[in-house]
Amino acid sequence: MIRISIDAMGGDHGPAVVIPALMTVATRRPDIRFVIYGREELVRPELAKFPKLAEVSEFFHCEIAVRMDDKPSQALRHGRWKSSMWKAVEAVKSGAADACISAGNTGALMAMSKFCLRTMATIDRPAIAALWPTLRGESVVLDVGATIGADAHQLIDFAILGTGMARSVFGVARPTVGLLNVGVEEIKGQEEVKEAGRMLREANMASMNYHGFVEGDDIGKGTVDVVVTEGFAGNIALKTAEGTARQIAGYLRAAMSRTLMAKIGYVFAKSAFDRLREKMDVGRSNGGVFLGLNGIVVKSHGGADSDGFAAAIELGYDMVRNNLLDRIEADLDLFHARNPHALSSRKSDVVTDAKE
C-alpha cells in the first residue's frame, strides 16, 4: 500500500481540481491511499461528489491555506504546524505518507520541505527536477529553480539525484547524463561546469553513463536521459520551452482557421494535431520533484487541471514504488566511497567560507 499526502488547498483551483484528480488516480492505482489536508468547508463538498474516494482516503481539517502570493518566510512563519501544506509535508516526515503532492506556492513548499524534511547527509542544497518532453520520449532536467548558482560539487549532487530519478521513473538501469553548457568542447564553459565534468568522467559510476557536455537544443532532442544545470539557467530554459510550446500552438490555431480550405484540412488532420497537442502539453509531464530531501515532495503546476494534478500524483506514486530515495542514497554512498576527496574538499570549503 502506498500512501500519498495531499495539500488540497494548493494551486489556482484548490479542491475543485485536486479531489477529482484523486478519484482518477484511485481508479487506476488500487493500492494507493490518500491523506488529505485542507479546509473542511471547501473540501467536504468536493469529496461528497465521489463516495468511493472515502474508502481510500482520510481527511484532516486545516484552518490555514498558504496563498500563492505568500513569501516563503511568511508562509513558514504563519503556516508552520497548522497549514494544509505543512501538514502534508509533515506526514512524510512522520511516516504517515510516502510522498507529498501540492500545487501550492513553490517557494513556500520548498521552504517548508527543507525545514521539515531536511536535506540528505551529503547534499548541500536540494534541486527541482522536471520531466521534459523530447523527440525520444522524456528526460529529467534539473535544477529548474531551487538553487541559483551552483559549484562543481553541487552539480555532481544534481547529477546523482537526477540519475536516481531517471532510474525510478524511466526504468533505465544506467541513464545517460549531460552537463548543460555553451558548447560540447571540454575547454568551454564556466570553471564550475568544467570541474564537474572532470569529476564525473573520473567517477566511473555503475549507475550513471556520463555523456559529457550538452547544449540547449540537446534537451528537446533527448540526447541524454538527465540534463544537469544550475537553477537560474534551468528555470529560464523551462519557461522558454513552455512559452515556445504555447506560441507554436497559437500559430497552428491561427493558420488552421485562416481560410475555408485550412479549416477543411484541419478536419482531415485533426488526429495528427491532437497527437502533437498531447506531446506538447505541459500537463502530461506535470510535476516538479524536490530532490535531495529526506522524503519525496512533488510540486504540481499551480494552474494544472485535474488530469495534470493526477499526473503529478502518479509521478510521486511511481517514485515511491521504485524506491527513489534508496537508489539515491546508494548512489551517493558509492560516489563518496570512491571519491572521498570530494566530500573532504567540500568540508574544507565550508570551513574556509566560515572563516571568511
Swiss-Prot record:
Its primary localisation, in coarse terms, equals cytoplasm
| Alphabetized UniProt keyword annotations | Cytoplasm, Lipid biosynthesis, Lipid metabolism, Phospholipid biosynthesis, Phospholipid metabolism, Transferase
Q: Name one GO biological process term.
A: fatty acid biosynthetic process
Where exactly are the transmembrane stretches of this chain?
Answer: none
GO molecular function annotation: phosphate:acyl-[acyl carrier protein] acyltransferase activity
The main enzyme category here is transferase
Q: What SUPFAM superfamilies does the record point to?
A: Isocitrate/Isopropylmalate dehydrogenase-like
Q: Which reaction does it catalyse?
A: a fatty acyl-[ACP] + phosphate = an acyl phosphate + holo-[ACP]
Q: Which GO terms describe its cellular component?
A: cytoplasm
Its pathway, per UniProt, is: Lipid metabolism; phospholipid metabolism
EC no. given is 2.3.1.274
Q: Where in the cell is it found?
A: Cytoplasm
Q: What does this protein do?
A: Catalyzes the reversible formation of acyl-phosphate (acyl-PO(4)) from acyl-[acyl-carrier-protein] (acyl-ACP). This enzyme utilizes acyl-ACP as fatty acyl donor, but not acyl-CoA.
Subunit info here reads: Homodimer. Probably interacts with PlsY.
Family, as annotated? Belongs to the PlsX family.
Matching PANTHER family, A to Z? FATTY ACID/PHOSPHOLIPID SYNTHESIS PROTEIN PLSX, PHOSPHATE ACYLTRANSFERASE
Under what name is this protein listed? Answer: Phosphate acyltransferase
Q: What is the lineage of its organism?
A: Bacteria, Pseudomonadati, Pseudomonadota, Alphaproteobacteria, Hyphomicrobiales
